[in-house]
A protein has these predicted regions:
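Sec/Tat signal peptide C-region and signal peptidase I cleavage site
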Residues: 16-20
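Bacterial N-terminal signal peptides
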Residues: 7-15
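Bacterial N-terminal signal peptides that target proteins for export
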Residues: 1-6
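Small-residue-enriched, tightly packed secondary-structure blocks
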Residues: 21-182
Length: 182
């Protein structure tokens, strides 16, 4: 019994030590953009949508959240991670947080992309002066459906469902943080 306990303790200590050396910046990155593999998969999915071509060509930059998880029963929340691009290169990582109240039920996972029309809009995001108010909304992209939207206050937001079902699909109340890569 004691020998099993010691073996388990030793194994646990070794696994903690090996995971402590993990560096997320060393994960597989695209050599052209510097983006993570997860971000590149999401970027490819958004670039495959013809209606977004003009946004990719004309935007000064964009924040791409490869996975946003959202759920709630009355009180809800969302959290996501992504990266910020400008001139085809990754500037740094971004995170998204949201807390919401009201009638909502369920859970979902989705991707989100925020296009910044001008440099000042990208700068506003990377300097930490950016959040969506309670009335903000995004365009949900569905296969085979026409996408018609324009910039509002220098940004255009699109989401792509990954899975789940949730009554309530606003982006209101989202707050963001940005951390530049060195």
């Amino acid at each position: 019994m004691i020998q099993r306990l010691l073996t388990l303790l030793l194994f646990s200590a070794c696994s903690i030590t090996s995971s402590a050396a993990w560096d997320p910046m060393q994960e597989s990155r695209d050599p052209d953009t510097g983006a993570s593999k997860k971000t590149m998969i999401a970027l490819k999915a958004f670039r495959a949508i013809p209606e977004l071509k003009a946004f990719f060509e004309q935007a000064n930059g964009f924040a791409l959240f490869h996975n946003v998880a959202k759920g709630g029963i009355g009180i809800g929340g969302a959290s996501g991670k992504g990266e910020v691009f400008q001139s085809g290169q990754v500037l740094g990582s971004a995170s998204l947080k949201q807390i919401s109240f009201g009638f909502q039920f369920g859970g979902q996972a989705f991707r989100e992309i925020i296009f910044f029309k001008e440099k000042q809009d990208t700068d506003r995001f990377t300097e930490g002066h950016f959040e969506f108010g309670a009335q903000a909304s995004a365009v949900l992209i569905k296969q085979g459906v026409s996408v018609e939207t324009a910039y509002s206050n220098g940004v255009a937001v699109f989401t792509m469902a990954k899975g789940g079902l949730m009554y309530e699909a606003s982006i209101g109340g989202q707050k963001f943080s940005f951390k530049p890569y060195d």
